[in-house]
Amino acid sequence: MARKTLRARRFFSLIFPFFFITSVYAEQTPESAKTVTVEAKNEMFAPQHPDQYQSWKATSEQSAREDALAEDPRLVILWAGYPFSRDYNKPRGHAYAVTDVRETLRTGAPKTAEDGPLPMACWSCKSPDVARLIQQEGEDGYFHGKWARGGPEIVNDLGCADCHNTASDDFAQGKPALTLSRPYAERAMEAIGKPFDKAGRFDQQSMVCGQCHVEYYFDGKNKAVKFPWDEGMKVENMEQYYDAIAFSDWTNSLSKTPMLKAQHPEYETWSAGIHGKNNVTCIDCHMPKVQNAEGKLYTDHKIGNPFDNFAQTCANCHTQDKASLQKVVAERKQAIHDLKIKVEDQLVHAHFEAKAAWDAGATDAEMKPILNDIRHAQWRWDLAIASHGIHMHAPEEGLRMLGSAMDKAADARTKLARLLATKGITHEIPLPDISTKEKAQKAIGLNMQQINAEKQDFLKTVVPQWEDQARKNGLLSQ
């Protein structure tokens, strides 16, 4: 009886603040990104919102770099011919958003504004300067050109104006004033029946995160960001959308498969999981309310692992202790990891077997159904593994996608075995040594010494010029 009473008190202590918040913000009308005057320098808001600013700044403490390719060299083969085969680190704090996109080998080593391998769109989730440029130049103007064009303009790390209408009266009065600062995100939410200006408070909290933590692609000649949600947000829906427009991110250099590269579909996978279905938002788990030294509540902007603030996050809903929940999460993470590796092994073999089939004289017609299976298998695998935290957000959906990927990869290999047999090849296709990142990169023909040297020269010569120009133009604090 005492236990039930305690739970009841706890329930009402949680629910009453929610009713209060709803009433306070019920009359808020979020302003469109098109009407916001964007101030991109985050430190400008420190005097007005000191606790939020200092906690945001503390994301710089999340500085460790984890090399995903070194941890799992199979990825190099799966992404052969694509910049991700050069460099792929696991995510770290928001304070490194601009630094990391400059330093990754994926963005190349451009010498001029018209040089380099990637488009302007690659800045889109890195800085409030993006919203500023879209306001100044329009979307077509912003997306036009190469990534290097944005170097002197996009200089402030992901921050205040990415999620808040910092020019609004509501923000000046200390209210969140949430906004979608990217018009393409606004359109995507409308496509799934969630117009931002009609969404409830809790929906909006996750939608602002869903501007960036999503799957997207670069559309048309201008390489504009678009979310592939026209048919829905499930892996099969997005696959259907991409297939219908014959889109591919690149062609795998081994198998010649037109591939899809998933980005970071946290919004989609969260929506498919128990937290999303019950509207437990990104904010509830990753940005909880905490107290400052004076006992005042504020939203912690040091976005991180919910277990780091267990009492303010998980314990609000769960009765289990921290160790018990950590054990559950670890078991789910391991199950997804184990299936992930099995799928990768199948895909690695499929890419090399497809190469052997081409080398043996296979025709486009013979290879088409096989390449389609490889494309669909790797897409489903990638959407599962690119969603960092799927073991927490939607473990069942993660396992389902990986199981489907395994089936598709097995189909491809069965068809390849039959095709190879018609070419007189009945032995197992040997794999090169891909036991380390370096060996795998050598196996696909990457000259990493040259790539790294070019990048270091870029960082020493070009980036300082970008920063000097930004300071002269008043875009970056001295």
Swiss-Prot record:
Known catalytic reactions: 6 Fe(III)-[cytochrome c] + NH4(+) + 2 H2O = 6 Fe(II)-[cytochrome c] + nitrite + 8 H(+)
Top enzyme class of this protein? oxidoreductase
Annotated binding of heme, by residue: C122, C125, K126
Location within or outside the cell: Periplasm
Identify which cofactors the protein needs according to its UniProt entry: Ca(2+); heme c
Q: Which residues cross the membrane?
A: none
- GO biological process assignments: anaerobic electron transport chain; nitrate assimilation
Where, by residue number, does heme c 4 bind?
C282, C285, H286, H393
The positions annotated for binding heme c 3 are H94, C209, C212, H213
Residues the entry annotates as binding Ca(2+)? E215, Y216, K261, Q263
Q: What GO terms are given for molecular function?
A: calcium ion binding; heme binding; iron ion binding; nitrite reductase (cytochrome, ammonia-forming) activity
Which sites bind heme c 2?
C160, C163, H164, H301
Residues annotated for heme c 5 binding in this entry:
H275, C314, C317, H318
Question: What's one GO-annotated cellular component?
Answer: outer membrane-bounded periplasmic space
Which residues make up the binding site for substrate?
A: Y216, H264
Q: In which pathway does it act?
A: Nitrogen metabolism; nitrate reduction (assimilation)
| Pfam families (alphabetical) | Cytochrom_C552
Span of the signal peptide: 1-26
Q: What does this protein do?
A: Catalyzes the reduction of nitrite to ammonia, consuming six electrons in the process.
Read off the NCBIfam families from this record: cyto_c552_HCOOH, PRK11125.1
Q: Which family does it belong to?
A: Belongs to the cytochrome c-552 family.
Q: What is this protein called?
A: Cytochrome c-552
